[in-house]
Swiss-Prot record:
Feature: compositional bias, Gly residues: 19-31
Region (Disordered): 19-47
Disulphide connectivity of cysteines: none
Superkingdom: Eukaryota
Protein name: Replication protein A 32 kDa subunit-A
DNA-binding region residue numbers: 77-151
UniProt record, GO biological process: base-excision repair; DNA replication; DNA replication checkpoint signaling; double-strand break repair via homologous recombination; mismatch repair; nucleotide-excision repair; protein localization to chromosome; telomere maintenance
Length: 276
């Protein structure tokens, strides 16, 4: 998972972060002493990177320092969403990442103050990202401390992530469920654009091939409008309040030039060519 970004090859299943020995070195550089055999058995799942939705993380229960979703223990997690807000401080960058399943999640990335590396670059709002990090709670507010933030170039990565969420939590709960009964984890997934006016629209009718995430998002919004006049550019701006107006305009022009959409009553109203 994430091999194409040069990130990590852990993920759920197998050996987690690739660690199979008694000492687990975390991506942030902090390790822990080798656990006993019993601790290995009881805490093995927490060493894996678990795909999650923001809704799941916010509803996770905490006992001492251990977070759980149902019977599944987790610490290292991944989420995929759009950056709604970014704020840089001398030692860290605070993001609000929205995957449309709940309120945006606080994601904090610590920066290296000694050198100007790519890790210190601020991801601008409106960008889609995949975040890997540790779930934390401070004063009853959950957040993710990120050790990896990578751009999402293809919206299929979002669909793939949601499938990984379902697979991982079904597998983990089947492993942790007591005999004679199972434990069900509610999976909150983003609604379609036509239902909620939000950004993601996972499903078979999401024509992402060859399009950037912004273009796919705008095309899905236009396709969701069933009126004869189509969707007005002003409405697009209102729906996409986190996206730059010039970015929206450029995406609309591209979609029009490529034949994905066409203008209707004027140059500010658009319909999808295969929306019927």
């Amino acid at each position: 998972m994430w091999n194409n970004h040069g990130g990590f090859d852990g993920g759920y299943g197998g050996s987690g972060m690739g660690g199979g020995g008694g000492y687990m070195q975390s991506p942030g550089g902090f390790g822990s002493p080798a656990p006993t055999q019993g601790e290995k058995k009881s805490r093995s799942r927490s060493q894996q990177i678990v795909p999650c939705t923001v809704s799941q993380l916010l509803s996770a229960t905490q006992n001492d320092e251990v977070f759980r979703i149902g019977e599944a223990e987790l610490s290292q997690v991944t989420i995929v969403g759009i950056v709604r807000h970014a704020e840089k401080a001398p030692t860290n960058i605070l993001y609000k990442v929205d995957d449309m399943t709940a309120a945006p999640m606080d994601v904090r990335q610590w920066v290296d103050t000694d050198e100007a590396s790519c890790e210190n670059m601020v991801v601008p709002p409106g960008s889609y990202v995949k975040v890997a990090g540790h779930l934390r709670s401070f004063q009853n507010k959950k957040s993710v401390v990120a050790f990896k933030i990578a751009p999402v170039e293809d919206m299929n990565e979002f669909v793939s992530h949601m499938l990984e969420v379902v697979h991982a939590h079904m597998a983990m709960n089947s492993q942790g469920a007591p005999s004679g009964g199972g434990s069900t984890v509610a999976l909150s997934t983003p609604g379609r654009v036509g239902d909620s006016g939000r950004a993601f629209s996972g499903g078979n009718d999401n024509p992402t091939n060859g399009l950037t995430p912004h273009q796919s998002q705008i095309l899905s919004l236009i396709k969701s409008c069933k009126g004869n006049e189509g969707m007005a550019f002003e409405e697009l701006k209102n729906r996409l309040h986190g996206m730059n107006v010039n970015t929206i305009r450029q995406a609309v022009e591209f979609l029009s030039n490529e034949g994905h959409i066409y203008s209707t009553i004027d140059d500010e109203h658009y319909k999808c060519t295969d929306g019927d």
